[in-house]
Amino acid sequence: MSNEHEFNIRLLEVFRTEAREHRQAILSALRKLEKGADAEREAEMVEKSFRAAHTLKGAARAVNKSQIAGLCQSLEAIFSLLKNGHGRLGKEMFDALYEAIDRIEMMESGNEDGDSALNSRLNVLRGALDG
């Protein structure tokens, strides 16, 4: 095996580990948000989710996982809008966000390609927040 090939394998291993951590951070924040929180705690959880989505997007780009990066871009945009006071999280939004996290996990494992229908749904929800 070439050094470049070994490096790429190691890079993907690191990506999977980091991706799992970022997904868990977003899931943890979403669960807390879904249970309800005061305004300060809600802002903290949205910020945490925004940062995790942003970091995961960059990591996905670094390992040429463009479909994961695309979903993360949608998540990041939604969390940015929420962070800036545009709209609130409702059942439909939570469902779509959880589905996106599940899809990212599947794509990390190479089990599934991106879902354009999910991306479209996230974009519609983002548009609704942006008003």
Residue ranges and their predicted role:
Residues 1-131:
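Non-catalytic helical tethers at domain boundaries
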